[in-house]
Amino acid sequence: MVATPDTTADVLTIAGRSFRSRLMTGTGKYRSFEQMRASIAASGCEIVTVAVRRVQTNAPGHEGLAEALDWQKIWMLPNTAGCATAEEAIRVARLGREMAKLLGQEDNNFVKLEVIPDSRYLLPDPIGTLQAAEQLVKEGFAVLPYINADPLLAKRLEEVGCATVMPLGSPIGSGQGIRNEANIRIIVENAKVPVVVDAGIGTASEAAQAMELGADALLINTAIAQAEDPARMAQAMAMATIAGRLAFQAGRIPTRSAAIASSPQTGLVGQSPATV
């Protein structure tokens, strides 16, 4: 039997609120609400992101989404997906805060900030993101900005008061894994707020890799929702997140160019007494 590590003391804290799970999930791209609920339960996550515009407009696949989950047990992370400008993102963030309040989370000021004018690669706009973040912080939001893995932008967003930074591993939904490891390492090294790797993770080994880099948490949606068995993939991602976190805390051995024997090299069969 494999021993299950006790991770209860290792909490993730964002804007003064603590969470036991370091895996966040989404609500999009599932084949049914039943699959979504089963996957969220299997993941053990406590934060679930919701696209405000799609819920507000009852976009296909999002009808009744706000009522499909028990928001007494899950912390809502409204997101500004679909916003191409800072102005749009600010308006949608305000709607998201009201939506959270209507669903019983009166003190929820969280927003996942996405400003994405690029419809092909879905890469975030750094200038628009910074502009929107500055305004939303002034309005009392806990801003979790989705960004390219740009260490200077990450630091600037931290300086204006963002609650986290969320660098992408690779483009949204691409399943390409972690394509910017060096920059994520720099962001982790410099950040004084949680670093959440968001987008591009396709399977559990990539989730573990992101956590081994020192990320504080992950946000994974497509890899779970579009898996052949979403609930099983959600469980795999949860376990990988924990494994990667433990490995980072444990500290990996240094990489070397030559082998180092794990057993003593003295007293080998065939050695003369003089060399033993």
UniProtKB/Swiss-Prot annotation:
Its transmembrane ranges are none
Instruction: Show the InterPro entries listed in the entry.
Output: Aldolase_TIM, Thiazole_synthase_ThiG, ThiG
State the Gene Ontology BP annotations: thiamine diphosphate biosynthetic process
> Which one of the record's GO molecular function terms can you name?
thiazole synthase activity
What does the record give as the active site? 112 (schiff-base intermediate with dxp)
The pathway it acts in is: Cofactor biosynthesis; thiamine diphosphate biosynthesis
- What the protein does? Catalyzes the rearrangement of 1-deoxy-D-xylulose 5-phosphate (DXP) to produce the thiazole phosphate moiety of thiamine. Sulfur is provided by the thiocarboxylate moiety of the carrier protein ThiS. In vitro, sulfur can be provided by H(2)S.
How is the subunit organization of this protein annotated in UniProt? Answer: Homotetramer. Forms heterodimers with either ThiH or ThiS.
* Protein name listed in UniProt: Thiazole synthase
Lineage, top ranks: Bacteria, Bacillati, Cyanobacteriota, Cyanophyceae, Synechococcales
